[in-house]
Amino acid sequence: MSITKDQIIEGVAALSVMEIVELIAAMEEKFGVSAAAVAAGPAAAAEAVEEKTEFDVVLKGIGANKVAVIKAVRGATGLGLKEAKDLVESAPAALKEGISKDDAEALKKALEEAGAEVEVK
């Protein structure tokens, strides 16, 4: 006569916590497995992306119209002429960090209209 699943469940339910721990250890040894929890992979990464509220705007390249890009950078960052020029010439460089998505998209649009290559991270 074979044991049914229901009988196994009833038998485990009747065990004490220490007996269950010993049973798990014996099963791990018998079947060569571990009862450790499996880490969540892609689902956890997807949740992290959804929760992102701060973005960085990175100047990747200046394009053909360097003067217009410098003006756009000055207007967006409040830097002086020399600082804005140095920042533009050091591309790729972070222009603003930790800003909202709307602000990041507006800044990206303004810089792209000036001829710059921009990335929002």
UniProtKB/Swiss-Prot annotation:
Alphabetical keyword list: Ribonucleoprotein, Ribosomal protein
Top-level division of the source organism's lineage: Bacteria
Gene Ontology annotations of biological process type: translation
UniProt feature coiled coil, ranges: none
Keyword Membrane listed: no
Keyword Coiled coil: no
GO CC annotation, single: cytosolic large ribosomal subunit
GO molecular function: mRNA binding; structural constituent of ribosome
Reported function: Forms part of the ribosomal stalk which helps the ribosome interact with GTP-bound translation factors. Is thus essential for accurate translation.
Self-association and partners: Homodimer. Part of the ribosomal stalk of the 50S ribosomal subunit. Forms a multimeric L10(L12)X complex, where L10 forms an elongated spine to which 2 to 4 L12 dimers bind in a sequential fashion. Binds GTP-bound translation factors.
NCBIfam families referenced in this protein's UniProt entry, alphabetically: L12 (TIGR00855)
Similarity comment: Belongs to the bacterial ribosomal protein bL12 family.
UniProt name for this protein: Large ribosomal subunit protein bL12
Species assigned in the record: Serratia proteamaculans (strain 568)
Lineage per the UniProt record: Bacteria, Pseudomonadati, Pseudomonadota, Gammaproteobacteria, Enterobacterales
